[in-house]
Amino acid sequence: MKVRASVKKMCRNCKIVRRHGHVRVICSVDPKHKQRQG
């Protein structure tokens, strides 16, 4: 999980999701693409 000021999709399988006031990126193909805005 990377914590970044600006989250972007890293591949076409990444999805941007808003959970508990945080913007997250989840990826079913590559778990390294997980990010959270912080």
UniProtKB/Swiss-Prot annotation:
List UniProt keywords, sorted A-Z.
Answer: Ribonucleoprotein, Ribosomal protein
Gene Ontology CC: cytoplasm; ribonucleoprotein complex; ribosome
Family matches, as Pfam families: Ribosomal_L36 (PF00444)
| BP-aspect Gene Ontology terms | translation
Q: Which GO terms describe its molecular function?
A: structural constituent of ribosome
Superkingdom field: Bacteria
**Is the keyword Ribonucleoprotein assigned to this protein?**
yes
In this UniProt entry, which cysteines form S-S bonds?
none
Q: Specify whether Nucleotidyltransferase is a keyword of the entry.
A: no
Name the HAMAP family on file.
Ribosomal_bL36
The family assignment reads: Belongs to the bacterial ribosomal protein bL36 family.
Q: What is this protein called?
A: Large ribosomal subunit protein bL36
Organism this protein belongs to? Proteus mirabilis (strain HI4320)
